[in-house]
Amino acid sequence: VLEDFKSKVGQHIEILELEQFGNSLFIDGEIQVATTDEHLYSSTFVGAGLNLNKNNERAAIIGGGDGGVARECISKNFNFIDWYELDSEVVDVCNKHLGDIGKKATEKNSVKCVWGDAFQSIKSIKDDTYDHIFVDLNDDQFCIDLAAKNMDSMIRILKPKGVITAQVGSQDKKPKQVDNWLNVFNHHFGNAKLSRVYIPSFDCSWNFSSSINH
């Protein structure tokens, strides 16, 4: 156990060194990311969006405290990346123990970190700002409801033909949850494309849903 504490926003954060998967982040008892296979998650996540729209001018990341999605956006040459993260302590602890994942994404000129409630923060963003929005929230019903409640706000800041992509959990373990996410996307966009990848540290396939703003 490398870290074990409760953050100021009330999340139970642990960094454990796992024999098979290296340093790994747990939040509230659930694994979020492991050093050895994080690239599978982030590359599939960002790739799912870019498969529907190649434009890489401007991206928003909502959540994603380990920095993997931000790093992947940098590697895909996005010019501007706004990273909205509630819990700066997650980012700090990941920079400290899982440094290779974020590769100091917070220090890159193309990345602007906005701390606090993302859905409050995006209220000040102009219409039609982003080519891509990546929603990397926890995979539970609370976050599905939160995203659904704020979907109109996200659509407002998404360019025409822009793409929103979310990690939606595992059809292997929680199929109803994935269906609930897909229902939200289909309701708001009329389209949803599911991508999946097997992640060994999660011991299951993981799903990402993308929708185009027609």
Regions found by a protein language model. Give the residues of each.
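Core SAM-dependent methyltransferase catalytic element
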Residues: 200-214
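Short strand-turn-strand beta-turns centered on an Asx-Gly dipeptide
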Residues: 28-29
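Short, well-ordered helical secondary-structure segments
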Residues: 2, 12-14, 100, 109, ...
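The AdoMet/dcAdoMet-binding core of the Class I SAM-like
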Residues: 21, 33-183, 188, 202-204
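Conserved S-adenosyl-L-methionine
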Residues: 189-200
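N-terminal auxiliary segments of SAM/dcSAM-dependent transferases
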Residues: 1-24
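Short, isolated positions in well-ordered beta-strands
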Residues: 13, 32-33
